[in-house]
Amino acid sequence: MALKNFNPITPSLRALVQVDKTSVWKGRPFKSLTKGISKTGGRNNHGRITSWHRGGGHKKLYRIIDFKRNKIDISAVVERIEYDPNRTAFIALIKYEDGQYSYILAPQKLSVGDKVISSQDADIKIGNCLPLKFIPIGTTVHNVEMKVGKGGQIARSAGTSVDLVGKDSGYAQIKLRSGEFRLIPLDCKATIGSISNPDQKNINLGKAGRNRWLGWRPHVRGVAMNPVDHPHGGGEGKTSGGRHPVTPWGFPTKGKKTRKNKRTSKFIVKKRK
């Protein structure tokens, strides 16, 4: 996919850069693989804000994606590549030999008419899904499971992938884009290739309103608030905040390590950069 620039007939078009979607399906999604999704506005079941700066946005249908790839040894043909408003990657509608349809994450260079399969005997080909024990070292993969049968959780965003760098004692060692090296059980599945739409990182929304369409509200700085609202608030005139950056609840932010998951730390061979 290429990037698309616009003739600046309005101020917002001057900066706008989008991904060219001319090769993506322009019709409606496959109806039986969609369901309604309700908005939360960033609120939990008590009505309290748990995710700031969320709200509004265009109405969306949720596309049911097959992250597990549990239909074993049955090949499928790619019917079309589609845009999905719920994620940055494109998705592929596939039709199995038995007539069943499914959505999967579309890897780069997957085309309409290509055949994909989930099998331990599958070829090392873009879109095929195999257990890590049957994938050669050095292969680039995506949609990697962390627990057997749970479905892919690692490398699902646009342009992402991980590298399989080793196998030992029942675990595969993978290298993530962050620089982290992690151990994954060899029976976990992964899909060959990198996720589609790598140019997503180069887009420019062009105006604040486009962010509102995506469901994001204005991000107010702490120094622009009153003391009752934020530790950085208040002061006479414009201030720097007067202290190291903190969250609204007083915890250090902007680079402070917050990971507290000792249970899975044993699976991290090397921490991210």
Swiss-Prot record:
<dbReference type="InterPro" id="IPR022669">
    <property type="entry name" value="Ribosomal_uL2_C"/>
</dbReference>
<dbReference type="InterPro" id="IPR014722">
    <property type="entry name" value="Rib_uL2_dom2"/>
</dbReference>
<dbReference type="GO" id="GO:0015934">
    <property type="term" value="C:large ribosomal subunit"/>
</dbReference>
<dbReference type="Pfam" id="PF03947">
    <property type="entry name" value="Ribosomal_L2_C"/>
</dbReference>
<dbReference type="GO" id="GO:0006412">
    <property type="term" value="P:translation"/>
</dbReference>
<dbReference type="InterPro" id="IPR008991">
    <property type="entry name" value="Translation_prot_SH3-like_sf"/>
</dbReference>
<dbReference type="Pfam" id="PF00181">
    <property type="entry name" value="Ribosomal_L2"/>
</dbReference>
<dbReference type="InterPro" id="IPR022666">
    <property type="entry name" value="Ribosomal_uL2_RNA-bd_dom"/>
</dbReference>
<keyword id="KW-0689">Ribosomal protein</keyword>
<dbReference type="GO" id="GO:0003735">
    <property type="term" value="F:structural constituent of ribosome"/>
</dbReference>
<feature type="compositionally biased region" description="Basic residues">
    <location>
        <begin position="254"/>
        <end position="273"/>
    </location>
</feature>
<dbReference type="InterPro" id="IPR012340">
    <property type="entry name" value="NA-bd_OB-fold"/>
</dbReference>
<protein>
    <recommendedName>
        <fullName>Large ribosomal subunit protein uL2</fullName>
    </recommendedName>
</protein>
<keyword id="KW-0687">Ribonucleoprotein</keyword>
<dbReference type="InterPro" id="IPR022671">
    <property type="entry name" value="Ribosomal_uL2_CS"/>
</dbReference>
<dbReference type="InterPro" id="IPR005880">
    <property type="entry name" value="Ribosomal_uL2_bac/org-type"/>
</dbReference>
<comment type="similarity">
    <text>Belongs to the universal ribosomal protein uL2 family.</text>
</comment>
<feature type="region of interest" description="Disordered">
    <location>
        <begin position="228"/>
        <end position="273"/>
    </location>
</feature>
<dbReference type="InterPro" id="IPR014726">
    <property type="entry name" value="Ribosomal_uL2_dom3"/>
</dbReference>
<comment type="subunit">
    <text>Part of the 50S ribosomal subunit. Forms a bridge to the 30S subunit in the 70S ribosome.</text>
</comment>
<keyword id="KW-0699">rRNA-binding</keyword>
<dbReference type="InterPro" id="IPR002171">
    <property type="entry name" value="Ribosomal_uL2"/>
</dbReference>
<dbReference type="GO" id="GO:0019843">
    <property type="term" value="F:rRNA binding"/>
</dbReference>
<dbReference type="GO" id="GO:0016740">
    <property type="term" value="F:transferase activity"/>
</dbReference>
<comment type="function">
    <text>One of the primary rRNA binding proteins. Required for association of the 30S and 50S subunits to form the 70S ribosome, for tRNA binding and peptide bond formation. It has been suggested to have peptidyltransferase activity; this is somewhat controversial. Makes several contacts with the 16S rRNA in the 70S ribosome.</text>
</comment>
<keyword id="KW-0694">RNA-binding</keyword>
